[in-house]
A protein has these predicted regions:
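An amphipathic, aromatic/His-enriched active-site/gating alpha helix that lines ligand/cofactor pockets
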Residues: 2-3, 22-43, 51, 63-104
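Accessory recognition modules or surfaces
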Residues: 3-8, 12-14, 47-48, 53-66
Length: 115
């Protein structure tokens, strides 16, 4: 549900060379469930169609009740022992992500309402 304080977080992950498949698998098998556990609502996930981004980029949007909730959600996610274990195991052969970009967004008054 969208409220006046609802924020959307656009996140762009730039995978380490050759690691996009492993990053997508981590999201598919673990990360989405952990996001839900920590109050982060997944809106959608994309991979670019064209190079050079096609081979190393994951883009997604999360919904949070507020900026404050987003900060608390990320803290609880990062402190979660299950996430720490998944993260460590998934990076046993090297880090999966080179760079993460995060931008918080607010819906405009003329935007179609999102779920």
């Amino acid at each position: 549900m969208h409220t006046a304080t609802t924020v959307y977080e656009l996140r762009v992950y730039h995978a380490a060379p050759g690691k996009l498949g492993e990053l997508l698998a981590r999201f598919r098998e673990h990360t989405l469930k952990l996001f839900e556990k920590h109050g982060m609502k997944s809106v959608a996930y994309w991979t670019p169609v064209d190079e050079p981004e096609k081979s190393d980029t994951l883009i997604y949007i999360l919904q949070h009740p507020s900026r404050e909730a987003a900060a608390a959600n990320w803290k609880s996610f990062q402190d979660d022992p299950e996430w720490k274990s998944v993260h460590e195991k998934s990076e046993a052969n090297g880090k999966l992500v080179d760079k993460i970009e995060s931008t918080f967004l607010a819906l405009t008054d003329f935007s179609p309402r999102l779920p």
